[in-house]
Amino acid sequence: MNVLSMFGRNATRETSSPAATAGRYADEGDWEGDDHQPATAEGSLAAFGLAKSYGGRKVVRDVSLDVRRGEAVGLLGPNGAGKTTVFYMITGLVKADQGRIELDGHDVTPMPMYRRARLGIGYLPQEASIFRGLSVEDNIGAVLEITEPNRKRRAEELDALLEEFKITHVRKSPSIALSGGERRRVEIARALASRPAFMLLDEPFAGIDPIAVGDIQALVRHLTTRGIGVLITDHNVRETLGLIDRAYIIHSGTVLMEGDPESIVASPDVRRLYLGEEFRL
């Protein structure tokens, strides 16, 4: 996926708050929603009553969840449980049949993916999304050209991101020459160039050597210390449970359980249906 397409043609990053911007889309006729809006805390990304069917088969039914700024939340479950569909409905890649997605209490359900990105919902796909024909600094700079019109501030922000993610030494390197861990750091740094309030990470441990797992975990923790809310879906359960604050376990298209990692692992139902009786953190 070309990440610039998430912002739309000739798009610029919104400088007002997500709530104010969502409201402006409503005024322009691009935003629709129910007359009744439930109370939702500022600084949250939430889904309510999501449902999705394919060919008459209901794969997601009445799933609700929330992520607050500064916390990491896992979206986990067995293959075919519906977790990926839920995740893609939140990103905007899949349209929900029922339910809604709210950012800071404002309905963003009808918005395409690029508008959600402009409001502050970042997305890092499972497959490599790096621009292979560009250098590291040009990868990050491509997004900064959209989000920061001032050339001097753009250069300063580029230097800061390279330093923050410890990739200054490869700034001139072609992206195709990076290791798996370096590539992930570049992708996350580039995602942060869009100044998201929330990051949705799809299989962040996929294609990563075991030695780099701790590096990715540290990067996710770094995002939360920045005040960014993180939603992760991944098949590497142990690694994911080792870094999140809470998790939602999806089974047969519904939320089987929500809780902290210790509560999840201790649940007889979760162990029986998903983790197995011998699972340990």
Swiss-Prot record:
InterPro entries: AAA+_ATPase, ABC_AA/LPS_Transport, ABC_transporter-like_ATP-bd, ABC_transporter-like_CS, LPS_export_LptB, P-loop_NTPase. Residues 1-38 are annotated as: Disordered. Residues 45-277 form the ABC transporter domain. GO terms for biological process: transmembrane transport. One of its GO terms (cellular component) is ATP-binding cassette (ABC) transporter complex. It comes from the Bacteria. ATP binds at G77, P78, N79, G80, A81, G82, K83, T84. Keywords: ATP-binding, Nucleotide-binding, Transport. Transmembrane segments: none annotated. One of its GO terms (molecular function) is ATP hydrolysis activity. NCBIfam families: LPS_export_lptB. Belongs to the ABC transporter superfamily. This is Probable ABC transporter ATP-binding protein AZC_3926. It comes from Azorhizobium caulinodans (strain ATCC 43989 / DSM 5975 / JCM 20966 / LMG 6465 / NBRC 14845 / NCIMB 13405 / ORS 571). The lineage of its organism: Bacteria, Pseudomonadati, Pseudomonadota, Alphaproteobacteria, Hyphomicrobiales.
